[in-house]
């Protein structure tokens, strides 16, 4: 999981784990 330039790190981490998609949040 890439490190998003924001404070919503846990949110993107959860989404990546749930959907299992190689999505890179910006």
Swiss-Prot record:
UniProt remark on cofactor binding: Mg(2+) is required for catalysis and for stabilizing the dimer.
Cellular-component GO terms for this entry: cytoplasm
UniProt key word Magnesium: yes
UniProtKB keywords: Cytoplasm, Glycolysis, Lyase, Magnesium, Metal-binding
Compartment(s) where it occurs, according to its Swiss-Prot or TrEMBL record: Cytoplasm
Pathway noted in the entry: Carbohydrate degradation; glycolysis; pyruvate from D-glyceraldehyde 3-phosphate: step 4/5
Reported cofactor(s): Mg(2+)
One Gene Ontology term from the biological process aspect of the record: glycolytic process
InterPro entries tied to this protein: Enolase-like_N
Keyword set includes Magnesium: yes
Molecular function terms, GO-annotated: metal ion binding; phosphopyruvate hydratase activity
Known EC number: 4.2.1.11
Catalysis: reaction(s): (2R)-2-phosphoglycerate = phosphoenolpyruvate + H2O
Subunit structure and binding partners: Homodimer.
Similarity field: Belongs to the enolase family.
Protein name: Enolase
């Amino acid at each position: 999981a890439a490190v998003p330039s924001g404070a919503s790190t846990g949110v993107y981490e959860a989404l990546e784990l749930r959907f299992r998609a190689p999505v890179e949040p910006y």
